[in-house]
């Protein structure tokens, strides 16, 4: 599992969000964003992410912390992204991921205070 989580971290930091979606999310993944369902399949998540990622011209992501416990990983990243319209998105987010058979089957994303 360590290698899978490392893959997620590296791809996320490189801005390869769509590629990591296809590689690491289960087809039937359930994704939540601050307690609200964001997507109920990899394809739905991919399509929603694609719209956002397409509007980003600069992508700077730093890993703040990581914990792996059994089949659950908790990753906190600080994101700084600049949109094509020069608007800066500056936020910190926690990803709590449940893994099964080498894929993320559930991910809960939480906005957290700036660290």
Regions found by a protein language model. Name each.
Residues 1-27:
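Short acidic-aromatic low-complexity motifs
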Residues 18, 22-69:
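A solvent-exposed, acidic/Ser-Thr-rich amphipathic alpha-helical stretch
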Residues 25, 79-81, 95, 111:
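Short beta-strand segments enriched in hydrophobic/aromatic residues
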Residues 55, 80-90:
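Short, cysteine-centered beta-strand-loop-beta hairpins and adjacent loop/turn segments enriched
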Residues 30, 87, 103-105:
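Residue-level signal for well-ordered, solvent-exposed loop/turn and beta-edge residues enriched
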């Amino acid at each position: 599992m360590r290698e899978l989580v490392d893959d997620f971290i590296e791809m996320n930091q490189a801005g390869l969000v769509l590629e990591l979606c296809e590689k690491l999310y289960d087809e039937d993944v359930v994704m939540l964003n601050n307690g609200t369902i964001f997507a109920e399949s990899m394809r739905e998540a991919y399509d929603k992410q694609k719209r956002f990622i397409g509007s980003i011209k600069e992508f700077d992501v730093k890993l703040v912390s990581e914990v792996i416990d059994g089949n659950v990983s908790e990753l906190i990243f600080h994101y700084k992204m600049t949109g094509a319209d020069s608007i800066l998105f500056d936020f910190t987010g926690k990803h709590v991921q449940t893994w099964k058979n080498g894929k993320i089957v559930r991910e809960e994303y939480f906005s957290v205070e700036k660290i």
